From Swiss-Prot:
Keywords: Hydrolase. GO terms for molecular function: glutaminase activity. Its EC number is 3.5.1.2. Belongs to the glutaminase family. The keyword Hydrolase applies. InterPro entries: Beta-lactam/transpept-like, Glutaminase. NCBIfam families: Gln_ase, PRK00971.1-1, PRK00971.1-2. It comes from Shewanella amazonensis (strain ATCC BAA-1098 / SB2B). This is Glutaminase. The gene is glsA. HAMAP family: Glutaminase. It comes from the Bacteria.
Length: 304
């Protein structure tokens, strides 16, 4: 059974790892974050949230936003419309690879690498008059926190360093798999990545993935079938090139971001968010992964 004392104990056990790994520095706004932060929050499907460490401090969620984007697309499109434009397979290349996009004729491997997330952002742009505002509404609804907001400094910083993502988008456009103005989609995409949320916010927002698509306020966000498929994609492709290692050590569907956050799901039971900014070689939170590994061991839970 999950108790406050367990979370406190796990955070204490993992603290000695702080200082190992490296904070993401290719986005200047992220490079300024202390590597000594560590937090965890767990929300059960009945709405109870427990946390320890820096669990209420907001951070840049970065690629964790790709879960919200894909969920938003599933709310707007038939699945065949999505999966005709993006694949469902692990990548095996870096998350911002141009080579793979070229070799596979503009169809990204999955929605959680940059190319795939840009296609999803393009889909949202096609159906929404104000995609940035709609995304904010979705995230605020899911997290039950109407103060969640974009970090303009982070969004602007990413836009100023957007050459590679722009190249990916234009390459996909050359293959006919990008329909809107590249600059407009990039601005929306960087805003999604700049969402500032705490472990508490994210653990609450992701409850629908643990509860057959039903959010904390009782609304069906996506169907039970769509939820299973989302979790399957998270299990195979949610942790960059570290997805196999994460499945082996933690055994939960998950999604990481270079801001140091990781969300993980125990279907039918709970959603978890950990945060520690220093990353391992795969770009995943080093201390955060260990924290989730210990939690899985203590609870005796895995999807496998």
């Amino acid at each position: 059974m999950l108790e406050q004392a367990l979370l406190d104990d796990l955070v204490a056990k993992v603290r000695p790892l702080l200082g190992q790994g490296k904070v993401a520095d290719y986005i200047p706004a992220l490079a300024r974050v202390s590597p000594y932060k560590l937090g965890i929050a767990v929300t059960t499907i009945d709405g109870t949230t427990l946390g320890a460490g820096d669990w209420q401090e907001a951070f840049s969620i970065q690629s964790i936003s790709k879960v919200f984007s894909l969920t938003g697309a599933m709310m707007l499109y038939e699945e065949r419309e999505i999966w005709s434009r993006v694949g469902k397979e692990p990548s095996g290349h870096s998350f911002n690879s141009l080579v793979q996009v070229e070799l596979e004729r503009g169809i990204p491997r999955n929605p959680f690498i940059n190319a795939g997330a840009l296609v999803i952002a393009d889909l949202l742009q096609s159906r929404l008059g104000a995609p940035k505002q709609r995304m904010l509404e979705i995230v605020r609804m899911l997290s039950q926190n109407h103060k969640v907001c974009y970090d303009k400094v982070v969004a602007d910083s990413e836009y100023q360093h957007s050459a590679r993502n722009a190249a990916i988008a234009f390459l996909m456009k050359s293959f006919g798999n990008f329909h809107n103005d590249v600059d407009k989609v990039l601005r929306s995409y960087f805003h999604y990545c700049s969402l500032s949320m705490s472990c508490a916010d994210l653990s609450r927002a992701m409850v629908y993935l643990a509860n057959q698509g039903v959010s904390l306020d009782g609304n069906e966000v996506v169907s039970p079938t769509q939820t299973r498929r989302l979790n399957a994609l998270l299990a195979t492709s949610g942790l960059y090139d570290g997805a196999g290692e994460f499945a082996y050590r933690v055994g939960m569907p998950g999604k990481s971001g270079v801001g140091g956050g990781i969300i993980a799901v125990i279907p039918g039971d709970m959603s978890v968010c950990v945060w520690s900014p220093a990353l391992d070689a795969s770009g995943n939170s080093l201390a955060g992964t260990r924290l989730l590994e210990l939690l899985a061991q203590e609870l005796g839970r895995s999807i496998f």
